[in-house]
Amino acid sequence: MFIDGKWIIREDIDVFDPYTLENIEKITALDREETKNAIEVTEKHKEIMKNLSPSKRYKILMKVAEHLSSKKDFFAKTISIDVGKPIKQSKIEVDRTLTALKLSAFYAKELRGETINSENGLIFTKKEPLGVIGAITPFNFPLNLATHKIGPAIATGNSVVLHPSSKAPIVAIYLTKIIEHVLKQMDIPRGVFNLATGNGEIVGDEISKNDNVNMVSFTGSVEVGESISKNAKMKKVTLELGGNNPMIVLKDSDIKLAAKSAVKSKFLNAGQVCISVGQVLVEEEVVETFTKYVIEETKKLILGNPLDKNTDIGPLISPESALRIENLIKQSVSEGGELLIGGNRQNSLISPAVINIDEENILSKIETFGPILPILTVKDSEEAVNIANNSKYGLQAGLFTNNINNAMKIADELEYGGIMINSSPTFRKDNMPFGGVKKSGLGREGIKYTVEEMSETKTVVIHNI
């Protein structure tokens, strides 16, 4: 759609407002040959990015942050319309994006190698870019997750082809316009950054297969991640995939705090968050109290128009997604789950649901990606850990306890990429390592760590003459 400094404008794909269901935009869908061309252009410009000084890369990122900051309200509103995210959550996403850009700018100047002692001469290392980064991003955080890939790519001197989700591409288009403006202002050829909109089956597939792409950075579903991993052959990949993230609540914890955390975290962005609470594993002595607090907190939530400042939960990304959640609730109940509150659907809206389940229930095994909070009673921490680890996923886990010995023991036992103690799994800072084990992903994100992933270490040895 934006290739080699030129916009390709067609009306190929309808984009809908998830709340009103109105058609808000028609966008270009690149075919395979156009996608190949976008990648070829990106590849031809990789030397330009490589040769930019660290201070110029820093300046690009800081200028993008500056322009974005001047349009914070516009971008927050666009996120809410594009995704259905409540406006107060969209504003937080914009702020986090600014942090990610500024951190990326910082690391543009911090790229450094090391000197290694040698009796026979000098050994040193230097960091170099990989070349072309294919960034494939999801709908749920269309601005922040894009900059988590674009920022480190630019910081390390890579050229970029960005493929946003076709479900919510509008934010990426406006971000690209800012990048275009900055590159033009700095007299840098616009072909160093290209935007490839369209269907993932074509555009994303070509990016993952194309030999001119040196690394694919993908955030999305396990199924697509596995496909990318197979297609990528020997190219580098980072995959940030899904999870059924457990939150363990022990009897010695602050039960009210745990309940508030579970509700706030589970229903963020209507549950459409990869690190959303998948299930809460509660010791039997306190499960009744915990459940009471959860229902009280859930009743306080306001469901509705994402542009209303009082709204806590907006729509899912589409009516089809909401129907899938409605059917999951029905299946859970048919398997013995007890629906305690919520679960009513109207178009793309689903009222937040709380369900008592057991380990064999469908909700204990999958990533729901919607506003369902399953509660599962356990005898003790050992059973909780066993259930949590009996999963193909391993993204993040939460643990509530006031016993530091329990906390450290369970943190060691849990098979997850991140363990949040006295917090839900839904915790992330933009500079912490982030990623999962098992089928939840490969590699780590977080600006500092993505910079490492997107650069190569070259060793230089100078022998005594």
Curated annotation (Swiss-Prot):
Pfam families: Aldedh (PF00171). It comes from the Archaea. The keyword Methyltransferase does not apply. It is an enzyme of class 1 (oxidoreductase). SUPFAM superfamilies: ALDH-like (SSF53720). It catalyses: (S)-lactaldehyde + NAD(+) + H2O = (S)-lactate + NADH + 2 H(+). GO terms for molecular function: lactaldehyde dehydrogenase (NAD+) activity. The active site is at residues 240, 274. Pathway: Cofactor biosynthesis; coenzyme F420 biosynthesis. Its EC number is 1.2.1.22. PANTHER family: ALDEHYDE DEHYDROGENASE. Involved in F420 biosynthesis through the oxidation of lactaldehyde to lactate. Belongs to the aldehyde dehydrogenase family. Homotetramer. This is Lactaldehyde dehydrogenase. It comes from Methanococcus maripaludis (strain DSM 14266 / JCM 13030 / NBRC 101832 / S2 / LL).
